[in-house]
Amino acid sequence: MFCLLNMITGILECGWISFGLAHAMPLWQILCYPLAYYLGKLFPKPFSLPKKLLFVFCSVTLIAAVILTFVPMPDIVRFVLTCLCLFLLSAVIQTVKDGIKSGEHSLLKRFFRVAGFALSPLAAFRPQIILFVAVVIAFCGLTKYTDSEYHFTVPDFKGGYSIAILFHQLHYFCYTHITIAAVSLALSKQPPVIDALGYAFTRSPAAFGSIAGILIFCGTQIIYILSEHIFSRLTKKSMTVFYIGQTAVFVILLSMSFITDTTLFIILWLFTGLCGGTVCTITKKLKQSVKYDKAPTTFSENAGCILGLLAAVFVSVFFCTYSPDIMLVCGAAGTLAAILCMIITMQKEKK
């Protein structure tokens, strides 16, 4: 069940990026879909929700999905209802995931999430079906969820570590989803370099670009997961690995903001996954230096995700076609902030 929940979250996070591209929506609206998903993901961390309320969330989502399927409405109303569905489903699924003990290996769980990303373009063609399937999976997950009382928990921040994690997530979500959209649009406007893909391109350039963009993103995720797995085991000099890897990410992101060649841009994007995997060393160092608690780390991660996406939405409203390049620079700045934060934290620990 845990792996299935992981897979559906991947579809919910990226599926409506493909939907928005297929329907030529403004970039800021496209980015609001993953923002709604991550707002829901943040909700269970500091709130603990009772099972009855989670069933209400699922029921409201089901009703909204039925309305979206059968009731004609203005596009803006459809947009708001879809964002509501993504928010509620994300809150339910994340709460259930937190409450279910999973015996599967972490790599397996994460690859199921990547599989969800790979399947997410289906939402461009059958968005209501995806919502119905997600609601069914959420209801099934709730049957295995142990009820809890409502309470609000204030996260116990771990000083510089929490801030560094927040900046890392902020840098990543400043550019990731907007880059998926930008690459998808670029690939929909130029014939593929691989001739065998030419037929798929001519049938539907928008669909081809959307699928190709998502699959390249999946490539960055696979490289990230594998590199993180390797970096956490290869060396005891965790901070050296972090500084080198994140400095490389800083340089790569700045370079990407000036590159106009799509192929070179994609290659560098894949390299961000390799170098970005070094972030695992922060958690490793945190476990070595203080009593480790996953909750504040998770909260910092989710807060960074939301701040990064909010920045991307805000910039895309005012700068439109220039916003992907601007957000790459913002992502580089976030990486630099995370590096400086860890340098200061390490210096304080030496005193």
Question: What are these language model-derived features?
Answer:
Residues 7, 75-93, 264-279:
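Hydrophobic core of transmembrane alpha-helices in multi-pass small-molecule transporters
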Residues 89-103, 277-291:
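Intracellular juxtamembrane helix-capping segments at the cytosolic ends
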